[in-house]
């Protein structure tokens, strides 16, 4: 048998200091905030990230942003 099932109700997981610190972060697991929550904020950050990516793409392609600037690789 590859796995062994232990039916001992007295065995609990090991308690560590790190686990005690991280436990409050996991206490909200499965709970859903009513309404839209932070969805609007997430949308704003996604839009800002999209603008950032467009700016990087334009710089990479030397398009609209760099039209009037001479670029020399020598």
From Swiss-Prot:
Keywords: Chloroplast, Membrane, Phosphoprotein, Photosynthesis, Photosystem II, Plastid, Thylakoid, Transmembrane, Transmembrane helix
InterPro entries referenced in this protein's UniProt entry, alphabetically: PSII_PsbH (IPR001056), PSII_PsbH_sf (IPR036863)
Transmembrane segments: 40-60
Gene Ontology biological process terms in this record: photosynthesis; protein stabilization
Any Gene Ontology CC annotation: chloroplast thylakoid membrane
GO molecular function, one term: phosphate ion binding
Modified residues (Phosphothreonine): 3
Membrane topology value: Single-pass membrane protein
Subcellular location: Plastid, Chloroplast thylakoid membrane
PTM remark: Phosphorylation is a light-dependent reaction catalyzed by a membrane-bound kinase; phosphorylation occurs on Thr residue(s) in the N-terminus of the protein.
HAMAP family: PSII_PsbH
Family per record: Belongs to the PsbH family.
Quaternary data: PSII is composed of 1 copy each of membrane proteins PsbA, PsbB, PsbC, PsbD, PsbE, PsbF, PsbH, PsbI, PsbJ, PsbK, PsbL, PsbM, PsbT, PsbX, PsbY, PsbZ, Psb30/Ycf12, at least 3 peripheral proteins of the oxygen-evolving complex and a large number of cofactors. It forms dimeric complexes.
Entries under NCBIfam families matching the protein: PRK02624.1
Reported function: One of the components of the core complex of photosystem II (PSII), required for its stability and/or assembly. PSII is a light-driven water:plastoquinone oxidoreductase that uses light energy to abstract electrons from H(2)O, generating O(2) and a proton gradient subsequently used for ATP formation. It consists of a core antenna complex that captures photons, and an electron transfer chain that converts photonic excitation into a charge separation.
Protein name: Photosystem II reaction center protein H
Lineage, uppermost ranks: Eukaryota, Viridiplantae, Streptophyta, Zygnematophyceae, Zygnematophycidae
Primary gene name: psbH
